[in-house]
Design a protein with these regions (language model features):
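Transmembrane catalytic cores of multi-pass membrane glycosyltransferases
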Residues: 1-3, 142, 149-154, 178-183, ...
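Signature aromatic-anchored transmembrane alpha helix within multi-pass, membrane-resident enzymes
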Residues: 328-336, 448-488
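Membrane-interface alpha helices of multi-pass inner-membrane proteins
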Residues: 52, 279-295
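Active-site lumenal/periplasmic loops and adjacent helix-entry segments of GT-C-fold
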Residues: 114-262, 494-499
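Hydrophobic/aromatic-rich transmembrane helices and adjacent perimembrane loops
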Residues: 155, 210-213, 299-300, 418-462
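Membrane-interface transmembrane helices that cradle and orient dolichyl/undecaprenyl
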Residues: 261-280
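Membrane-embedded, hydrophobic transmembrane alpha-helices
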Residues: 1-122, 339-346, 447-450
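Extracytoplasmic
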Residues: 459-460, 466, 476, 480-634
Length: 765
């Protein structure tokens, strides 16, 4: 992770510093240091996405663009006119912050703004700022402790990333012909990072996603530091779970698109006399960049613009109304372009699709689950700040987002493609739409030094900041929550069973080297091979964004697998198949005389076609709770992704708690000479052993104790009968851990304990 941080800082810090200087000439080094990583990363996303959109992306051209961007940034921050009065507005403000006096007489506004910002900088609570920065650093904890992320979305992003590395565009991989329609910035920047550091595509996606979250957090600290609420920004973000949960679930583009909110908060939450034309340009640039990352970011920033316009046109000052009209023009241009693309390019393909609500109405229960405490405090903040311009903008921004969530209430509505597109785009908006607006509102109220703008010029702003008792209590809650979150992150780094691929799947990638022809892979998360050797074609691809598929072998190959259509595989030169212990195709191939294991690692298998039908077929038997009286039934987290069950395993698996001695009843078929047990280790128990009084050549064996799926094979003693396997443990007590699957509904246990889940037995003769 350190290498990733160094590369990202080295390439984005100077451009971000320059953009921070332009958008906020009053910023000092501390504020620029907070803003630069986020603004620089936003520019890198926009630049990389633009190159891919223009179909000219390459590693070399990307580096040329990075160098050019840094040269422009260097000139921006170093070149100044010797005559202060002839400098640009942001440069004159910068000079005013350093006590320089311009020759022009029109410096009243500049001096007033400089005075306000200098007061904010003097009143900073540096220890609290330091605490906020440390809290933000926890976003980098997971990629430091583990290699690959949890969730399933990252696998699709990794496949896209690898295609950009190899092909320079989002063409479909393997035996498929077509392309993906997906925002280009994230996969292209991940590809650049992967190529630069020689990283696995999945690792690059993982690290860039968490780096994006970190920069969003410190960027918001920098943006709200302009209002004297920098430290409170991170504390307010800590009251919600939304963006953190989305990052944990590997929804990285949605999180990265929040970088546009940093620009929005920095430029749109300020008095009219402090707004300049380059702020409008900055917002327009941010809209373009976030639209290339993920459309949700552009929608959210667009609604912030709308909120700003709604309150700007009601201000009494004519200058304010002119500014509001200019912003309205900008918003109209982007909205027109966005709707044109949606209606002409994307939406027609969704004409037959109904409005979709995968996770329910996002403005209801999901909002409360992921942002409940933050929402409660924000309601109080909205009341307290109702007479201020900044408070009204933030409140209206949240209200507009909430109204947007109503699209999920009309689930099933057809023939309105724009609504269908919105419902698919915003299917999980409770995790990423409301977190920042609510946190901004809370931070402005939380800070005791914030100076906000009265909505009515003739009136003085009458509002009181958050009571100190409440402020310190909430600070304690956030610190405690951060400690718990860090502890959970450390615990989960030892739970690879939560990954959407098994350890064997990853280990088996090396066996793919040198294979001629194409390889059949399952059309499921564990079947999408993002790191296949160059030239090797696999059959399955992830459904990400809109898939334009003109040719594919996946369906025909799957039918051929289940019907033993060997002619098909010979004609297509598809002589190998790759299966995961997480999937179901393995059971069909194992019992077919036309497929033979070529390489096996912990249940993951590379199969070779045997056209003569002379492969030795094992006997497979499922294990259920009736075979293990001391086990408890636990749901299979992947039960909804398994559509065939020839072993009658059902939706549950027998789970043996660490420290519990148990007997597993088995019945060996006649002629069996070897038994293989497939099991899933939950957590990292000290050690687990299996023994049998008869039936095994060696009566005592140690099983693997690392998290995830494993396969252990034992030679049988054919002169005796085996009826019972006894499992014992080195430790007498199981270790507790917080199981995130209990929150998502994929499991029923939240406060879980370590142990093993039995899957099935394979008898070889």
């Amino acid at each position: 992770m350190l290498g990733t941080v160094l590369v990202m800082l080295a390439t984005s810090m100077l451009p971000g510093w320059a953009l921070a200087s332009v958008l906020d000439g009053s910023s000092d080094r501390l504020r620029k240091g907070l803003l630069a990583p986020s603004l620089g990363l936003l520019l890198l996303y926009g630049m990389s996405g633009t190159l891919l959109l223009l179909k000219v992306w390459s590693i070399g051209l990307m580096w040329v663009a990075v160098v050019a961007l840094n040269l422009v940034a260097y000139r921006t921050v170093t070149i100044r006119n010797e005559v202060v009065a002839q400098r640009s507005h942001w440069q004159r403000l910068e000079a005013a912050m350093h006590g320089e006096v311009a020759e022009s007489a029109a410096n009243t506004t500049l001096s007033k703004e400089a005075e306000t910002q200098l007061r904010f900088q003097r009143q900073r609570n540096l220890p609290l700022m330091g605490i906020g920065f440390v809290i933000a650093l926890t976003a980098l904890l997971s990629p430091t402790l583990q290699t690959l992320p949890f969730g399933v979305d990252w696998i699709g992003f990794a496949v896209l990333t690898q295609q950009v590395v190899l092909q320079g565009e989002l063409v479909l991989s393997g035996t498929n012909v077509g392309f993906w329609t997906y925002p280009p910035a994230y996969p292209s920047l991940s590809a650049w990072l992967a190529a630069t550091l020689n990283l696995d595509a999945g690792v690059a996606v993982f690290r860039l996603g968490h780096w994006s979250l970190f920069t969003v957090l410190i960027g918001l600290m920098g943006a709200l530091d302009r209002h004297g609420a920098g430290a409170q920004a991170m504390l307010a973000m800590g009251l919600g779970l939304g963006l953190f949960a989305k990052t944990f679930d590997s929804g990285y583009p949605s999180v990265a698109s929040q970088l546009g909110m940093v620009v929005g908060v920095l430029t749109l939450f300020r008095p009219t006399d402090q707004r300049q034309r380059y702020h409008t340009v900055g917002v327009g640039l941010a809209l373009w960049c976030v639209a290339l990352i993920h459309p949700t970011g552009a929608i959210y920033l667009g609604l912030l613009l709308l909120s700003h316009v709604l309150h700007g046109v009601n201000m009494e000052d004519e200058t304010q109304r002119v500014w509001a009209r200019n912003v309205a023009y900008l918003a109209s241009i982007f909205i027109t372009i966005g709707f044109t693309v949606a209606l002409l390019v994307v939406a027609p393909r969704l004409f037959e699709e109904a409005v979709f609500s995968e996770y329910g109405w996002q403005g209801g229960r999901p909002l409360l689950v992921y942002n409940g405490p933050l929402l409660a405090v924000a309601c109080l903040a909205a009341i307290a700040l109702r007479q201020t311009l900044e408070g009204s903008i933030a409140t209206t921004w949240f209200a507009l987002l909430w109204l947007l969530s109503l699209v999920h209430i009309v689930e099933g509505l057809q023939h309105v493609p724009v609504l269908s597109l919105l419902s698919y785009t915003l299917y999980s908006m409770a995790l990423h739409a409301f977190h920042v607006p609510l946190a901004v509102l809370v931070a402005l109220w939380w800070s005791p030094t914030t100076a906000l703008t009265a909505k009515v010029q003739a009136n003085e702003t009458t509002w009181k900041p958050m009571p100190q008792v409440v402020a310190w209590s909430l600070t304690g809650v956030v610190l405690l929550g951060t400690l718990v979150a860090a502890t959970v992150a450390v615990q989960l780094s030892h739970h690879d069973e939560l990954l959407a691929v098994s350890p064997g799947d990853l280990a088996l990638r090396d066996a793919l080297e040198g294979i001629d022809g194409s390889v059949y892979t399952e059309n499921m998360h564990w079947g999408y091979v993002w790191n296949a050797p160059a030239g090797l074609e696999t059959t399955s691809i992830p459904t990400l964004g809109l898939v334009h598929l003109t040719q594919s072998e996946q369906s025909a190959a799957t039918r051929a697998v289940y019907s033993d259509n060997i002619t098909y595989f010979l004609e297509k030169n598809m002589r190998h198949a790759l299966t995961s212990p997480l999937g179901t195709v393995q059971w069909t191939l194992a019992t077919s005389p036309f497929w033979e294991p070529m390489a096996q690692v912990d249940g993951a298998t590379l199969w070779a076609l045997k056209p003569e039908g002379d492969a030795i077929t094992p006997v497979l038997t499922g294990i259920d709770e009736s075979d293990c009286s001391d086990c408890t039934a636990r749901l299979d987290p992947w039960r909804d992704h398994k559509f065939r069950d020839p072993l009658n395993l059902g939706r549950e698996r027998p789970f043996l708690l660490e420290g519990t001695t148990a007997d597993l009843e088995v019945e060996a078929p006649s002629g069996a000479i070897e038994m293989c047990l497939v099991y899933e280790v939950i957590g990292s128990p000290d050690a687990v052993y299996v023994n049998a009084s008869s039936g095994l050549e060696r009566p005592f064996h140690a099983l693997q104790a690392t998290a995830g799926y494993h396969q252990s094979c034992f030679a049988l003693n054919t002169s005796s009968t085996m009826e019972v396997l006894t499992f014992t443990w080195k430790s007498e007590e199981a270790a507790g851990w917080l199981n995130p699957l209990g929150l998502s509904g994929r499991d029923t246990v939240l406060f879980d304990r370590t142990g093993i889940k039995f899957q099935w037995l394979e008898w070889r003769s």
